[in-house]
Amino acid sequence: MARAIILMADSLGIGAAPDADKFGDIGANTLAHLLKAYYDETGTALSLPNLSKLGLIDACEAAGKEPCLVSNRSASQGAWGYAKELSSGKDTPSGHWEMAGVPVLFDWGYFPKTQPSFPQEFIDELIARTGIPGILGNCHASGTTILEQLGEEHVKTGKPICYTSADSVFQIAAHEESFGLEKLYQVCETARSLLDEMNIGRVIARPFLGSNNQDFARTSNRRDYSVLPPAPTLLDVLAKDGGEVISIGKISDIYAHQGITQKHKAPGLINLLKKTNELMQSAPDHSLIFTNLVDFDEMFGHRRNPVGYAKALKEFDDYLPTILNALKADDLLIITADHGCDPTFPGSEHTREYVPVIAYQPGMTDIPLGERNSFADIGQTLAQWFNLPALEYGDGFIDKLTTSK
């Protein structure tokens, strides 16, 4: 029986989506622009031989209609295409859920006011239920900038830092030692229950350490509290069929722990990839290994650091042969993304972009998949791969994969 491995390169968009104008994202192209920024700073094109060989650069140039500056480019030996998003938003849950067959066709709740951002009744109830002395922030903010601005006051007062963004999200930052990690999680759980009626997609715990605003840094103990997907996803269907659904990184949180049979955490890009390789050695047949590579988005996309993003992508490319060499004959590798986050774009938010659809099996030859009308095409393909009932959304391309070897 078959296995599948998904490497979700969080935020690796490859060109503005057809509806990018509705999001203020005309001209966005995460991959092409970080490659250009790297070239402009270093004078050399980034070498991504393994991702190039799988078709990532072909997909980016087809989707974004602009050149991708890479060296050591070789002909594709994988199936490659690009998908537009059917969901109404450009957020993390929408992208992940749609990829698993459940697009978000409703509108999330948001906090549109930049400051103060949150309803006073909600703040009052959160304080009453948790016993916190108040909150700091109450605004739209960059998660790193707000630590510099309010971290010391938080440590002195015990008031957690609460902030949001253009996404449907409520984020709480607190010091792991002075405030306490478990206390932070408890406050987040209370906030989650209060925000359900507002249809806020995620509450995120953002713990940090450090002694002053010069060295405050987030830790790896982030936790996401998502609402439940509105319908069963591919993960639920596979788990119900007796399969293993192995979450690595924040995947389990994003799917609100639905359809997950194993949960594994690892700090940082390379450790996430190493954990993936480790579990590929032991995962039984009829398993899905699903890894979110969050650093691309969190460390470089939102922080608008294109050269750092490029260097991280190079680390991914360098490790990729280890993953490829671990593939068995009946394994299918998928590399994709959940949205864009162009590090050269104004602001600090996600960007509405096409995402890569890369599929690879040992022995595969070049096969263009073209433009896909939904991220759900990936989920439908995996349903076919695992011989599961068809999902409601998505146009599978398994026939192209099985005839291309």
Swiss-Prot record:
Protein location: Cytoplasm
Catalytic activity as recorded in UniProt: 2-deoxy-alpha-D-ribose 1-phosphate = 2-deoxy-D-ribose 5-phosphate; alpha-D-ribose 1-phosphate = D-ribose 5-phosphate
Binding site for Mn(2+) 1: D10, D338, H339
GO biological process: 2-deoxyribose 1-phosphate catabolic process; 5-phosphoribose 1-diphosphate biosynthetic process; metabolic compound salvage; nucleotide metabolic process
Known pathway: Carbohydrate degradation; 2-deoxy-D-ribose 1-phosphate degradation; D-glyceraldehyde 3-phosphate and acetaldehyde from 2-deoxy-alpha-D-ribose 1-phosphate: step 1/2
Annotated Mn(2+) 2 binding sites: D297, H302, H350
Cofactor binding comment, as recorded: Binds 2 manganese ions.
Pfam hit, one: Metalloenzyme
This protein's UniProt keywords: Cytoplasm, Isomerase, Manganese, Metal-binding
Domain of life: Bacteria
GO CC annotation: cytosol
Gene Ontology molecular functions: magnesium ion binding; manganese ion binding; phosphopentomutase activity
Enzyme Commission designation: 5.4.2.7
Necessary cofactors: Mn(2+)
Family classification: Belongs to the phosphopentomutase family.
Summary of the function given for this chain in its UniProt record: Isomerase that catalyzes the conversion of deoxy-ribose 1-phosphate (dRib-1-P) and ribose 1-phosphate (Rib-1-P) to deoxy-ribose 5-phosphate (dRib-5-P) and ribose 5-phosphate (Rib-5-P), respectively.
The protein's name: Phosphopentomutase
Species assigned in the record: Pseudoalteromonas translucida (strain TAC 125)
Gene symbol of the encoding locus: deoB
